[in-house]
Every structure is written in structure tokens, then in C-alpha cells.
Amino acid sequence: MERFLNSKARRLGSCSHPAFYLLCVPDEDTSCSTIYLPLKRRADPDQLFSDLLGGTQRLWSNRFGNEESFPGRVRALVDTFCWIARAPPLGNPLRLEERIAWRIQRLKSGQTALIEKKKQKIEEDVRHQCQQTTCDRC
């Protein structure tokens, strides 16, 4: 099966990655919606989860440039992953979807916090400069 997935990935001209293969398959509302993972990773659920999350994030940001729509579309990808890899589902698929959505939310809030921290640093630097000299920005 793994050989089939790898050859199919090459034949369809998909992007390849050591951990997963993206195969673009048109469907009703997306232009690319399937992720294939090599079976050799099947033994490690944590690695599979990490690969699935990384793959789906890259897939959505590359194809749609809009991660806002990502969490609501995860279920189909999770189902596709479980079906294609012929692996037992990693727990309840709904629970896995929640984990992925939570992880994405955490990543987004971390990015927001980092941006806010940088803004505060700039404001503090400007205030510090203004205290030392007279300037228009004070």
C-alpha cells in the first residue's frame, strides 16, 4: 500500500514531504482536500497527529491562504486520513478534530500575543527616547 501511495503521489505531481504526501483532488467546495501519509509512520500516533496537523495547516494556507476556514474542514481530512492509511482511528475522530482545532487556536493566539508584545516593545522604546529628548511622537 505504501508503495502505491508513493507512486500515486509522484504520478499526480503532488507536493512531497518526508512525513506526508499531499494529493490534490477536486471536490464540491475545495480544490485540494486529501492528505496521504506513508504507512511506516503508523506505529507512532503522536507523530501521525503531528504530521496530520502540519500537513493540513500547510495545505490550507498554501491552497486558500485563509486559515480561518481551516478548523471546520478538518473532519473530512481526518476521515480521509483514517481511511487511506487503513489505520485504526486515533481515538474518537471528533476528539481528534477538537485537538486539531484547539492546537490551531493556540498557535494563532500565540502569534497574536507575540505581535502585541512587539508592539508594546516599540511603544516602550519610543517613550524611552521621548523621555531623553524632545520629539513629535510624545
Swiss-Prot record:
It comes from the Eukaryota. This is Putative uncharacterized protein encoded by LINC01559. It comes from Homo sapiens. The gene is LINC01559.
